């Protein structure tokens, strides 16, 4: 159970994130979903960084905050803990290739994980926890940023397992892991409904 609201980047600039536990930025570079040129606004960057740093949870799918600027492809790469290699830093070794096992988000996931078309050439920053990787391409990662957390996933086509992964990721980045099983089905093919007013 979650209350969902769609925010514009103007809403975010006006402080709308303050009323939320989790924000999702998902999509391919240059699309309205990812944000495109909106990420060329330092005020937007600062608002989102501040919100996460103070305890907000940020989820990125595909190419979140993608706008080539200041030597980074993901403007919020420091928050997500990942960035996309475009050839500018090929001479720099990326050593964070070790997969963390037993993470809360993947606790009941079964292989293979489905990223759809996914993303290639995503690499993790040194302190990022890599949850799934193939070769040198990071497909899933989490990162602490101040009091907040961020989660990155290379793609998120709809299926039962990805629904559960997203649900668990929302709880994780919001620091609400203990509330996960308040209304929860052990079988990922089932859903539970709760009507507190009835």
Language model features: what each stretch is:
Residues 1-22, 185-194:
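Aromatic-Pro/Gly-enriched surface loop or interdomain linker
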Residues 3-7, 131, 151:
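General small-molecule cofactor/ligand-binding pocket signal
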Residues 7-13, 43-46, 135-139:
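Alpha-helical scaffolding within the catalytic cores
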Residues 15, 32-33, 66-72, 139, ...:
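Short catalytic/ligand-binding loop motif for oxyanion handling, primarily in non-cytosolic enzymes
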Residues 19-22, 55, 127-128:
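Short, well-ordered alpha-helix to beta-strand connector turns
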Residues 21-31, 59, 150-152:
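Structural motif
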Residues 30, 35-110:
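A glycine-rich, often tryptophan-bearing local segment used as a flexible ligand/cofactor-contacting loop or short
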Residues 85-146, 154-165, 175-198:
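Catalytic beta-strand/loop cores that center a nucleophilic Ser/Cys/Thr
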